[in-house]
Amino acid sequence: MTQQITLVKDKILSDNYFTLHNITYDLTRKDGEVIRHKREVYDRGNGATILLYNAKKKTVVLIRQFRVATWVNGNESGQLIETCAGLLDNDEPEVCIRKEAIEETGYEVGEVRKLFELYMSPGGVTELIHFFIAEYSDSQRANAGGGVEDEDIEVLELPFSQALEMIKTGEIRDGKTVLLLNYLQMSHLMD
């Protein structure tokens, strides 16, 4: 027997920027016992992220920006170094990530490669992130990047070896960025 889920109640606690649900559901275990759970679930939509890399120069493009949740959780500056990313809204993942790449990094990417889709915090957040990589060159730089009007993004072109070292030193602590940098290392695309 497989587990069965029955929704008992879905109460919206907040629908400001994203939606916070208070969900009550019954979970029927494999042995037939029914367990009632009450959980808060944060629905922020799905997203996409991309790591830009240059195999000839042995560099990657990352961004640095303020992330309020990290600041609330003790990151004194609130600054986070991460891969370019954004919410899908109503776009397809590849369309979204191309748009975000030019807005945030200033690079107009060519061929992109989708790697995988992952839930990053499935215990309470609905977001499914689509992960991409793309090679970039200096000739693809269309503008300075930096995000849209309500963003303050610094574009960082770093040696790949330095970015990997920044994981070890704790300078890079963003999960999606660590995953993509490690993928790039394991794939030997930078060898």
From Swiss-Prot:
Motif (Nudix box): 86-106
Magnesium found in the keyword field: yes
Database matches in SUPFAM superfamilies: Nudix
Keywords attached to this entry: Hydrolase, Magnesium, Metal-binding
GO molecular function: hydrolase activity, acting on acid anhydrides, in phosphorus-containing anhydrides; metal ion binding
Segments forming domain Nudix hydrolase: 43-180
Binding annotation for GDP-alpha-D-mannose: 17, 38-40, 67, 85-87, 104, 127, 150-151, 176
Signal peptide range: none
Reactions mediated catalytically: GDP-alpha-D-mannose + H2O = alpha-D-mannose 1-phosphate + GMP + 2 H(+)
InterPro entries: NDP_pyrophosphatase (IPR004385), NUDIX_hydrolase-like_dom_sf (IPR015797), NUDIX_hydrolase_dom (IPR000086)
Listed EC numbers: 3.6.1.-
Positions that bind Mg(2+) 2: 100, 104, 151
Cofactor: Mg(2+)
CC per GO annotation: cytosol
Transcription regulation as UniProt keyword: no
Pfam families with a match to the protein in the record: NUDIX (PF00293)
The protein's assembly and partners: Homodimer.
Record-linked NCBIfam families: nudix-type nucleoside diphosphatase, YffH/AdpP family (TIGR00052), PRK15009.1 (NF011585)
Function comment: Nucleoside diphosphate sugar hydrolase that hydrolyzes GDP-mannose as its preferred substrate, yielding GMP and mannose-1-phosphate.
Free-text note regarding domains: In the dimer, the N-terminal domains are swapped between the two monomers, such that residues of both chains contribute to the active site.
Entry's family note: Belongs to the Nudix hydrolase family. NudK subfamily.
Protein name stated in the entry: GDP-mannose pyrophosphatase
Organism this protein belongs to: Escherichia coli O1:K1 / APEC
